[in-house]
């Protein structure tokens, strides 16, 4: 059984089976590769079955702009960043870190998969042999992204939290 088959078998759950636990790293690395690696170790020691990372660059998912559509406002923690670009710049995981996280997680026998946000991220993740792709809920209408993930021949998890019935039909 190859490594991908082992991972895919994790999703084959019967009633009464223990839950599949996936830990999301997202921006929880606090801007430190050491924290990111320790996060993976902690996830494994806490019993996680899988680790998920987000792979994007601020320049590929938004514009550096002060126009209202790109500003973060309101009474929430994100508003402190000012713009979407500034938020994504702070929260993104540098791609060389992603490669290190994949390597370190493999040593821990902790499978890693990812949410890519564009073709460049998919190309990068294919180089890491990412076994599964997850489409984030806000990207559920990005048919090009979904098709690009599908072309890899790997399973896709689609988050539907923000999706309407029409969005699901289109996806």
Model-derived segments and spans:
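Conserved anion-binding
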Residues: 141-171
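Conserved, mostly hydrophobic/aromatic
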Residues: 24, 43, 125, 159
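Hydrophobic faces of well-ordered beta-strands that scaffold small-molecule active sites
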Residues: 21-23, 51-53, 112-115, 131-135, ...
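Glycine-rich, proline-tolerant flexible connector loops at the mouths of alpha/beta enzymes
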Residues: 49-92
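Catalytic domains of carbohydrate-active enzymes, especially glycoside hydrolases
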Residues: 38-57, 128-129
């Amino acid at each position: 059984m190859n490594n991908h088959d082992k991972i895919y078998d994790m999703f084959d759950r019967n009633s009464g089976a223990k839950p599949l636990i996936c830990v999301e790293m997202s921006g929880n690395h606090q801007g430190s590769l050491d924290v990111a690696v320790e996060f993976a170790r902690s996830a494994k020691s806490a019993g996680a079955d899988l680790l998920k990372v987000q792979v994007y660059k601020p320049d590929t998912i938004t514009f550096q702009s002060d126009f209202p559509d790109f500003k973060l406002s309101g009474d929430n923690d994100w508003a402190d960043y000012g713009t979407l670009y500034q938020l994504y710049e702070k929260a993104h995981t540098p791609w060389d870190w992603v490669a290190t996280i994949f390597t370190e997680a493999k040593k821990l026998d902790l499978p890693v998969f990812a949410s890519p946000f564009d073709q460049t991220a998919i190309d990068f993740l294919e180089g890491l042999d990412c076994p599964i792709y997850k489409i984030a809920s806000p990207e559920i209408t990005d048919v090009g992204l979904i098709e690009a993930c599908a072309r890899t021949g790997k399973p896709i998890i689609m988050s539907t939290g923000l999706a309407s019935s029409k969005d699901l039909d289109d996806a």
